[in-house]
């Protein structure tokens, strides 16, 4: 843990004291995540990627001023992903704000082998079809068998990969060139993997994994 971080929230104090040991436990605690350092501590191998940079000029009394709006995705490549937007007069502070917001928006997703063509039981794809939307953009993500890869657009591929999805089919509609809405639609679709209720009495043909997993073979995806 960083020596500079002094937890200020109840969740932060529980993490610092070792009472909460995983990101999954932190999210399931229902306590608000307001300190990005919690994510840094519980997911030390988190990766980040800038997926959109927008620059806008506006006239002021002192002349033209540039404003940056930057979108960043973070993930551990194993069941956790977050998306954030940051705005500032300069690029570096905007990226930092976006990175912090992405960490505060971290979520746990479900994975599995939802493709009837595969049935390997590993956490390589989506457990079932999910849909997401943002603005005019609508996206559908479908499970795919091992080896297909990510048959989606570049932005969706970046988000799915950093979330730990290796194989998927995707179909998008609307103004998909609006990168921010496209990214948010993908993020919202992944959020649906954890919202679907699964009847505990149903016997699943393949396992469904939440968050970071170790496959049945004993090897981590």
From Swiss-Prot:
Highest taxon above the source species: Archaea
GO biological process: translation
Keywords: Ribonucleoprotein, Ribosomal protein, RNA-binding, rRNA-binding
GO MF: rRNA binding; structural constituent of ribosome
Matching InterPro entries: Ribosomal_Su5_D2-typ_SF (IPR020568), Ribosomal_uS5 (IPR000851), Ribosomal_uS5_arc (IPR047866), Ribosomal_uS5_C (IPR005324), Ribosomal_uS5_euk/arc (IPR005711), Ribosomal_uS5_N (IPR013810), Ribosomal_uS5_N_CS (IPR018192), Ribsml_uS5_D2-typ_fold_subgr (IPR014721)
Function in brief: With S4 and S12 plays an important role in translational accuracy.
Record's subunit section: Part of the 30S ribosomal subunit. Contacts protein S4.
Name the UniProt record assigns to this protein: Small ribosomal subunit protein uS5
Gene: rps5
């Amino acid at each position: 843990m960083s020596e500079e971080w002094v937890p200020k929230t109840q969740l932060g104090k529980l993490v610092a004291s070792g009472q909460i040991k995983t990101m999954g436990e932190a999210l399931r605690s229902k306590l608000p995540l307001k300190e990005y350092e919690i994510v840094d501590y519980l997911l030390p191998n988190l990766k980040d990627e800038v997926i959109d940079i927008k620059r806008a000029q506006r006239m002021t009394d002192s002349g033209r001023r540039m404003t940056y709006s930057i979108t960043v995705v973070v993930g551990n490549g194993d069941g956790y992903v977050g998306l954030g937007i940051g705005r500032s007069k300069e690029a570096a502070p905007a990226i930092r704000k976006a990175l912090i917001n992405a960490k505060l928006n971290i979520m746990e997703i479900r994975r599995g082998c939802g493709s009837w063509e595969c049935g390997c039981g590993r956490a390589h794809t989506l457990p079932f079809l999910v849909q997401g939307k943002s603005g005019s953009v609508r996206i559908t993500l479908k499970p795919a068998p091992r080896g297909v890869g990510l048959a989606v657009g570049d932005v969706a591929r970046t988000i799915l990969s950093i979330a730990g999805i290796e194989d998927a089919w995707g179909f998008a509609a609307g103004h998909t060139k609006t990168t921010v809405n496209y990214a948010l639609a993908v993020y919202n679709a992944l959020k649906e993997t954890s919202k679907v209720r699964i009847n505990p009495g149903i016997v699943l043909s393949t396992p469904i994994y939440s968050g970071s997993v170790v496959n049945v073979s004993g090897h981590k995806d």
